[in-house]
């Protein structure tokens, strides 16, 4: 009957050839080639046909001999191969078996491809919560209708390339199915605790088994359709005026929160909702009895990026307080339904925190400097008066000395 094999990088096919009415004791040659049943042409791998040749000397006119083919079958996944054999005696072909419809000469290489999704959202966005689930739809080809198969899946951590471990155990799922046709689909559901998976990308690896033998698998750590993306956000709050984290407690305060995101679905609709928290109390900041909130709707073009949420408030009564921004990211369905997918709420996170301080007291402006001019002497200004009196006394002494000298000289002249 039909034989199945896994399309591995190295597949060995053994074709057992029965012969009769051949010359015993003579050297014979068997030449085999693999054919693509769908096209009716020789199978080509990397541009080359897959062939095998065996020379043997039969001891009797009838018997069996094995012809072995070894090849890379990864490119042939999903194909049905048929072995054609020709028997030569010298240069003469004396027998052949070339029947594309012969089940005994046929090797089936099944294939499977998978598409993973979050059943709650209907897309590839994972929810980091205690009871999470992933549904993987496996599309298979070249199975045997009516036979029982097992599909087995494992969740992989794309970053490490290793199995995802939750509580030190891999996350797996398994189910049996019986295809009605050689090609079709089947589903496998994974249920697990995803609370610690924010920011991670998981990849579903699948394999199909027939009688405990793997006959098809899909194990591509970089495959987007097999991946589930768990979003993550981080925030950085600053003064909307100068970009630092110190804000004057004015009547008009602007806080700008830059939210970086990872693992979103490009083209999908999202909504960020933020609220200001009083770090001292750990509760929402209330102004006039109402929380201070802000929100931003956006559609990412890439899986990773950033967006801003801006808060405006009267901060005149908040001097000395430290405010922390809490952000929650929602996925918005086509009907407008908002579904929370992740958040960033850490009351001790310095990056999410701004500090409000009192306005400094007004400092009077210093007078403009002008060239100094001597002021007139004023009553009560002792230093200038003493200075002038000293100068005056010196002048009087000098005048007196000159007068005495003048009088003395005059008298001397008169006596002469």
Residue ranges of model-derived segments:
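Short, solvent-exposed loop/edge segments of extracellular or virion-exposed proteins
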Residues: 1-3, 113-124, 234-245, 375-378
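Short, solvent-exposed loop/linker segments at the N-terminal edge
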Residues: 3-11, 123-132, 245-253
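Aromatic sugar-binding surface patches on proteins
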Residues: 59-70, 180-191, 301-312
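Short glycine/proline/serine/threonine-rich loop/turn segments at secondary-structure transition edges
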Residues: 73-83, 194-204, 315-325
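Short beta-strand elements
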Residues: 93-110, 214-231, 335-361
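C-terminal low-complexity, Ser/Thr- and acidic/Pro-rich disordered "stalk" regions positioned immediately N-terminal
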Residues: 355-383
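Juxtamembrane/start-of-transmembrane alpha-helix segments at the extracytoplasmic/lumenal side
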Residues: 380-394
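C-terminal membrane-anchoring or membrane-association module
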Residues: 397-416
């Amino acid at each position: 009957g039909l034989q199945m094999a896994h399309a591995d990088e190295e597949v060995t096919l053994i074709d057992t050839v029965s012969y009769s009415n051949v010359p015993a004791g003579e050297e014979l040659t068997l030449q085999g080639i693999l054919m693509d049943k769908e096209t009716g042409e020789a199978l080509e791998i990397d541009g080359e046909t897959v062939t095998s040749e065996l020379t043997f000397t039969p001891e009797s006119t009838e018997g069996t001999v094995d012809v072995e083919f070894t090849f890379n079958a990864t490119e042939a996944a999903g194909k049905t191969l048929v072995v054609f054999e020709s028997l030569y005696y010298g240069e003469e072909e004396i027998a052949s078996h070339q029947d594309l419809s012969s089940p005994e000469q046929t090797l089936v290489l099944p294939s499977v491809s998978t598409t993973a999704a979050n059943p709650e959202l209907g897309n590839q966005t994972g929810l980091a919560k205690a009871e999470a689930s992933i549904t993987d739809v496996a599309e298979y080809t070249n199975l045997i209708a009516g036979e029982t198969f097992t599909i087995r899946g494992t969740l992989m951590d794309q970053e490490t390339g290793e199995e995802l471990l939750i509580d030190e155990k891999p996350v797996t799922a398994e189910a049996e199915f019986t295809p009605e046709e050689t090609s079709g689909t089947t589903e496998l559901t994974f249920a697990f605790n995803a609370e610690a998976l924010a920011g991670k990308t998981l990849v579903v690896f699948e394999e199909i088994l027939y009688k405990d033998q793997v006959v098809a698998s899909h194990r591509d750590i970089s495959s987007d359709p097999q991946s589930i993306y768990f979003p993550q956000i981080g925030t950085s709050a600053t003064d909307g005026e100068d970009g630092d984290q110190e804000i004057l407690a004015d009547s008009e305060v602007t806080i700008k929160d830059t939210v970086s995101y990872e693992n979103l679905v490009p083209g999908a609709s999202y909504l960020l909702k933020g609220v200001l928290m009083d770090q001292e109390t750990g509760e929402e900041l209330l102004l006039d009895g109402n929380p201070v909130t802000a929100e931003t709707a956006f559609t990412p073009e890439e899986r990773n990026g950033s967006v801003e949420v801006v808060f405006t408030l009267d901060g005149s009564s908040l001097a000395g307080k430290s405010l922390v921004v809490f952000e929650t990211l929602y996925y918005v369905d086509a009907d407008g339904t908002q579904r929370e997918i992740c958040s960033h709420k850490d009351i001790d996170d310095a990056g999410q925190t701004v500090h409000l301080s009192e306005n400094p007291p007004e400092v009077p402006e210093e007078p403009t400097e002008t060239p100094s001019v001597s002021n007139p002497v004023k009553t009560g200004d002792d230093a200038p008066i003493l200075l002038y009196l000293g100068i005056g006394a010196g002048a009087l002494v000098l005048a007196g000395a000159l007068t005495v000298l003048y009088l003395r000289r005059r008298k001397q002249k008169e006596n002469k």
